[in-house]
From Swiss-Prot:
GO molecular function: 4 iron, 4 sulfur cluster binding; iron ion binding; NADH dehydrogenase (ubiquinone) activity; NADH:ubiquinone reductase (non-electrogenic) activity; quinone binding
Organism: Cytophaga hutchinsonii (strain ATCC 33406 / DSM 1761 / CIP 103989 / NBRC 15051 / NCIMB 9469 / D465)
Protein name: NADH-quinone oxidoreductase subunit B 2
Main location: membrane
Taxonomy of the source species: Bacteria, Pseudomonadati, Bacteroidota, Cytophagia, Cytophagales
Requisite cofactors: [4Fe-4S] cluster
InterPro entries (UniProt xref): NADH_UbQ_OxRdtase-like_20kDa, NADH_UQ_OxRdtase_20Kd_su
Length: 181
């Protein structure tokens, strides 16, 4: 048949009011429902983000009730709009100030690929200077799309191992962007 072995639950952790789980699962659940976004908005997508934060869409339902305007307190960097090459070092500095774990969302066509601005002065995607976890398409994306992007970050936050940030793969990713810990 199959040589797959199903892990048995540990003894002594059953009964009313008890459950058996891993520390990764508990911390993932807490991270998933307590994301603090840092908006880095420069263009039209920033307007759509303001609509997303309004009462019509109620982003608080998704655990992102409190936007942070300090990188040291933020979990999710939402980059929205056109990023000029002169702004690149500022964006990277903001990213480096964020504490681990951190996630980056490129909201809209301009942040993802430069959008319609294919010029020498516009960064053709923020993934050239910082690692991006989620891309939200659109010009500008609708609030529903931004919420869907945040829900994707929630999925990443809930399933990410506590040890992933210490893995050789993650360190290689940071080295690719020349980011020191």
């Amino acid at each position: 048949m199959s040589d797959i072995k199903i892990e048995e639950k540990p003894d002594g952790l059953e009964g009313p009011g008890f459950f058996a789980t891993s520390l990764d699962s508990v911390i993932g659940l807490a991270r998933k429902n307590s994301l603090w976004p840092l908006p880095f908005a420069t263009s039209c997508c920033g307007i759509e983000f303001m609509a997303t934060m309004a009462s019509t869409y109620d982003i608080a339902r998704f655990g992102a009730e409190r936007p942070s305007f300090s990188p040291r307190q933020a979990d999710v960097l939402l980059v929205m709009g056109t990023i000029a090459k002169k702004m690149g070092p500022v964006l990277r500095h903001v990213y480096e100030q964020m504490a681990e774990p951190k996630w980056v969302v490129a909201v809209g066509a301009c942040a993802s690929s430069g959008g319609i601005f294919d010029t020498y002065s516009v960064l053709q995607g923020i993934d050239r200077i910082i690692p991006v976890d989620v891309y939200v398409p659109g010009c500008p994306p609708r609030p529903e799309q931004i919420i869907q992007g945040l829900m994707r970050v929630q999925d990443l936050a809930s399933t990410e191992s506590l040890r992933r940030r210490e893995s050789p793969e993650y360190k290689a990713l940071l080295a690719k962007y020349e980011i020191e810990e």
